[in-house]
Structure formats: C-alpha cells, structure tokens
C-alpha cells in the first residue's frame, strides 16, 4: 500500500545536528546543591546551579588543570563550582576564580585563558534545561536568535506536568522510530497495554488491526502526522508530541491544539481537560540513547497528581522493558545492512508504518541517514551485544530511573 507524504521542496537544505538545542534534564530532577554529570551527543557535560546568577549552567565536564571531571566536585560556600581534585573554583561564566596552590603574591595564573572551563549556552524552557552543543563564544547569545522547540501546553499553570527519564542500550534512531510505531503495541507490550476498542473481527489473540496513519508537511524541521485517535508532531531532532486534537503547526518548532478556549501567557488552551504526551529523544553515544518523557494533564488535587504519577511511572517502565532487548538486537541488524539501506531492507507495506517511514525519509533526505557524531565516533561502531539478562534489568534494580512532578522531586 503506497504511503503519501506532503513534502516541502527544500532540496538543498541539510539538517545540522550541532546547530540545535538539546534537552539535558527536567528541572525537577536536578538538585541545586550538587553538580550533575550527563553525556549528550558524546559530550560529557556537568550541570550545576549558579546561585549567584540564579541560573542552571552547563559546562564541559573537564577541569583545565588535570582534566578531572568537575561533576565529581561540589558547590563551595560562595556558590562556585569547585573541582574536588585540587580545589580549583569556577564561576558561572567558566572563569577560574581561585587556585589554592598559587601564591597570593605571584602572577594571577587563575586569570589566564587556559584556566577557564568550556561553557555551553543553556536555557530553561518548559521546565527542562536545554543546552547548545558548542562552547564557541559566538554562540553565547544564541538563545536570542533561536530557541528550543516550545510546547505551550507545558506552561499551562492549570495542569500538571509529569516527567520521567531513562537511558537505553540502543541508539537515537531506533528510540525515535519505536515511539512512532503504534503497530507494535498489542504485540511487544501484550498484557501490559490494552486496546481501548478491540477490533470487531479479531484475527489473533493480541488484537492488532489496520489503522489510518499519515504524514504531512515533511521538511528539514520534521513533520506532522495524523492517527485515528489524534495527531503527532516530530520537531527535529528530539521532540515528539502526541495530541488529542488537530495540530496547529507554528514557527520555532511549536505545536498546539487548534481548538482552543482560553489564553494563558499569549498561548491558547482548551477549557476541557486534555492530555499531551511528550517525548524528548536524546543521542548519548553510538548504541545508547536517553528518553525524557511524560504528559501534561488537568487534575484536581495533589493526591490525584501523586497517584497518577505513580501509576504512570510503573506502567511506562513495564512498557519500555518489554521490548528493550528486541530493540537492542534490531539496531545491530540495521547497522549490518546500513542505515542508508533501511528502506530497501525493510518491507513496510501498511499505513501503520507511515510515521516510521516518515522519520526514516527525513533522516535520508535531510540528515545524512543517521545521527552525525561530528567525527567523535563512527556511527556504525556499536558496543558489544549484551546478553538479554543484562539488558533487561528489573525496574527495582535500575540506578538511573527517575520520575518527578513539576515542582517536586522524586526517585
């Protein structure tokens, strides 16, 4: 069955992976008292709260002295980031403010350029810390020219945002296409996620059925899609949202409901309770990715928020565990045939494959077929295949599994 795509004609426009904003972590999962280590795009960064500027900072996770990780350091009594190895201290601009070993009557070596730490532009939007992956000073004010994709519903004060994040032993491309694939749900997640409306003519135990799925307005910035139960929007490279109502495609990667009844901070929202599911897919390194995901929902009381969040936490982790090993192996098979040959190697004849095909078409047409690691890695060099029992670690044993409600912190 032929799948149609409404593509914007931009034949000479290529997607620049390193000229984009990338999500780091939800604010509610960050402790202001300590620095935090993260790897994004193969870059080791440290995230910390600069109380002097009242802002989250993202630095290169390397002390210029002996290359020790600053994420293992501490925030000193003056609010500076201190390297725990030799005590060097840095302010929010990356300037070294104190070297304990330097004599006070000697040359001010702490002011030398080589004593500075690389600083990445960062901002907070939709209660998430974002960073721009370049320490070049020319990007210091990049947020004034280009902002991260904005989801207005996440700034609606009458609703609750619930966040989770988790690292996965498979890459960015497989992570994105799996989220876009509704056809696998009754099979890969059988017994965990039930269909709301079972098919009238049930052909198997799981209850799979044909569905109308389509992709529209595919260009270098991503695409929007339509499913029977609602709409989706992929804003390259990281943001994938599911909406109950038609998507209003706006500038700067924004998307919101088209049927609206109230206005908050210049943005429109429906009066009736509604839900937006959001997913931020983050390349970590070849064969590894991170997902920040959650939902926005109108709830009445704090106890409803806690219960809803806990149920969401438990159910979603069962879901992602159930196809974890399958995707770990699938990625290696894709690499064997080559990412550029995905369309030839995979037989995707039904409309239910439209979003996955749309994502792969976007990759092939605009983004070099797969994530570009900027020379840091060869994208085809994946880590060794792990045994199933190592990949599918029970939720109770996970160290990097977090969830939170906007304005609170839980693990």
PLM regions: where:
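C-terminal catalytic domain of Rieske-type non-heme iron oxygenases
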Residues: 9, 52-55, 137-411
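Rieske [2Fe-2S] iron-sulfur-binding domain
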Residues: 9-15, 24-153, 411
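Polybasic, low-complexity association/targeting segments
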Residues: 19-21
């Amino acid at each position: 069955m032929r799948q149609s795509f409404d593509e914007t004609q931009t034949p000479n426009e290529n997607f620049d992976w390193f000229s984009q904003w990338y999500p780091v972590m939800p604010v509610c999962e960050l402790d202001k008292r300590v620095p935090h280590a993260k790897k994004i795009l193969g870059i080791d960064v440290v995230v910390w709260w600069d109380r002097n500027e009242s802002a989250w900072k993202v630095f290169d996770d390397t002390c210029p002295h002996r290359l020790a990780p600053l994420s293992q350091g501490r925030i000193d009594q003056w609010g500076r980031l201190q390297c725990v190895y030799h005590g060097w201290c840095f302010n929010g601009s990356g300037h070294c403010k104190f070297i304990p070993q330097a004599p006070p009557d000697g040359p001010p070596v702490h002011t030398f350029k080589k004593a500075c730490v690389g600083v990445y532009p960062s901002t907070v939007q939709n209660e998430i810390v974002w960073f721009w992956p370049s320490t070049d000073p020319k990007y210091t004010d990049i947020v004034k020219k280009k902002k991260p994709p904005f989801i207005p519903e996440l700034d609606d004060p009458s609703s609750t945002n619930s966040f989770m994040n988790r690292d996965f032993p498979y890459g960015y491309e497989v992570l994105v296409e799996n989220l876009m694939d509704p056809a696998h749900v009754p099979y890969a997640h059988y017994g965990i996620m039930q269909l709301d409306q079972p098919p009238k003519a049930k052909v198997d135990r799981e209850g799979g059925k044909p569905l109308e799925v389509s992709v529209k307005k595919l260009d270098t910035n991503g695409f929007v899609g339509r499913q029977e139960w609602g709409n989706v929007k992929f804003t390259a490279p990281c943001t994938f949202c599911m909406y109950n109502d038609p998507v209003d495609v706006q500038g700067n990667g924004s998307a919101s409901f088209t049927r609206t009844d109230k206005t908050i901070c210049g943005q429109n929202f429906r009066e009736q309770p509604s839900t937006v599911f959001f997913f931020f897919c983050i390349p970590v390194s070849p064969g590894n990715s991170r997902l920040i995901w959650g939902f926005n929902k109108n709830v009445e009381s704090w106890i409803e928020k806690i219960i809803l969040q806990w149920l969401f936490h438990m159910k979603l982790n069962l879901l992602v565990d159930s196809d974890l090993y399958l995707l770990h192996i699938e990625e290696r098979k894709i690499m064997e045939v080559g990412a550029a040959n995905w369309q030839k190697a995979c037989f995707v004849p039904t409309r239910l494959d439209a979003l996955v095909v749309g994502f792969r078409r976007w990759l092939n047409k605009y983004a070099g077929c797969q994530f570009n690691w900027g020379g840091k890695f060869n994208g085809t060099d994946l880590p060794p295949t792990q045994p199933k029992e190592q990949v599918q670690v029970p939720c109770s044993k996970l160290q990097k599994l977090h969830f939170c409600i906007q304005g609170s912190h839980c693990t």
